[in-house]
């Protein structure tokens, strides 16, 4: 089957129904393409006006439909979905050249994580970093080898209700494609624990594709189901990146990496 033909999922709003899903996978081919090329669906549409690559002469070929094209995956677990994709399997499109997506043979033991890296266009050749510094004011995460800055990511971090825990922390471990225990009462500021829902893993999980666990209990660095909110919306105390940046960062850090949170 082609790269674009896979099962897509309708993600319900209700956490109880989310917990019934096997996986919180991609909702559409459009969303999957945008994550693969580290951008938004809107940018991909701008690069492919009318459903064909910008600057290409002539009309689009068969199978390269535009905005009114319906989903091509008849085997999807959600054949009743009314969402129409702009892009279709087999369509020739223009995309950002993100590079560095080679996964070295034998480098990743977890096959599910290897599949995630491939779907996000993240290669295994990443720098090993000694220190990361998160700036709440700057909405940035800077990664260093010694004194050399080797990576800079935009992040969302903390809120007045759940402030970023300023200070130095250790990395305890990493969880790839983790399930997520979700308690709406706690996240809405309630003092009492409410009903907890165990949400399945996937790119549309509240913590995205990876959780980098910190020595501060309940706090971590993780991905997101809503990449367009990074750098804009606040988070529940944790540090949130796009899924592709979180996956890159996971390949850079280890338990010996120093973590500093600044105001």
Predicted regions and their residues:
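Second-shell loop/turn segments in exported
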Residues: 16-34, 80-82, 127-131, 198-202, ...
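Extracytoplasmic/secreted envelope proteins and their assembly/folding machinery
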Residues: 30-31, 41, 45, 90, ...
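Cell wall/extracellular polymer interaction/catalysis modules
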Residues: 82-85, 91, 96-168, 172-174, ...
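Extracellular LysM carbohydrate-binding repeats and other cell-envelope/extracellular binding modules
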Residues: 1-5, 43-112
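Primarily a LysM-type cell-wall glycan-binding module
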Residues: 1-46
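Exported/periplasmic cell-wall-interacting domains
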Residues: 53, 185-263
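N-terminal post-signal-peptidase region of extra-cytosolic proteins
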Residues: 30, 46-49, 65-82, 115-130, ...
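Sec-exported extracytoplasmic/periplasmic mature domains
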Residues: 35-53, 98, 146, 247, ...
């Amino acid at each position: 089957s082609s790269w674009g033909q896979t099962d897509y999922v309708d993600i319900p709003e209700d956490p109880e129904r989310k917990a019934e899903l096997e996986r919180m996978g991609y909702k559409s081919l459009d969303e999957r393409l945008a994550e693969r090329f580290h951008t938004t669906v809107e940018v991909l549409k701008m690069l492919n006006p009318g459903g064909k690559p910008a600057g290409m002469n002539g009309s689009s070929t068969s199978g390269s439909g535009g905005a009114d094209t319906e989903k091509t995956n008849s085997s999807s677990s959600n054949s009743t979905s009314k969402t129409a994709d702009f892009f279709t399997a087999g369509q020739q499109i223009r995309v950002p050249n993100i590079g560095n997506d080679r996964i070295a043979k034998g480098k990743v033991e977890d096959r599910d994580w290897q599949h995630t890296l491939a779907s996000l266009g993240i290669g295994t050749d990443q720098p090993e970093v000694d220190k990361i510094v998160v700036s709440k004011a700057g909405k940035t995460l800077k990664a260093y080898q010694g004194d050399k800055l080797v990576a800079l990511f935009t992040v969302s971090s903390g809120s007045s209700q759940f402030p970023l825990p300023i200070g130095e922390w250790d990395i305890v471990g990493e969880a790839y494609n983790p399930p997520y225990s979700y308690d709406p009462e706690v996240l809405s500021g309630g003092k009492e624990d409410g009903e907890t829902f165990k949400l399945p893993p996937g790119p549309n999980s509240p913590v995205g594709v990876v959780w980098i666990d910190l020595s501060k209990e309940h706090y971590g660095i993780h991905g997101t189901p809503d990449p367009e909110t990074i750098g804009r919306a606040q988070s529940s105390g944790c540090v949130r990146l796009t899924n592709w940046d979180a996956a890159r960062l996971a390949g850079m850090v280890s338990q010996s990496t120093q973590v500093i949170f600044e105001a």
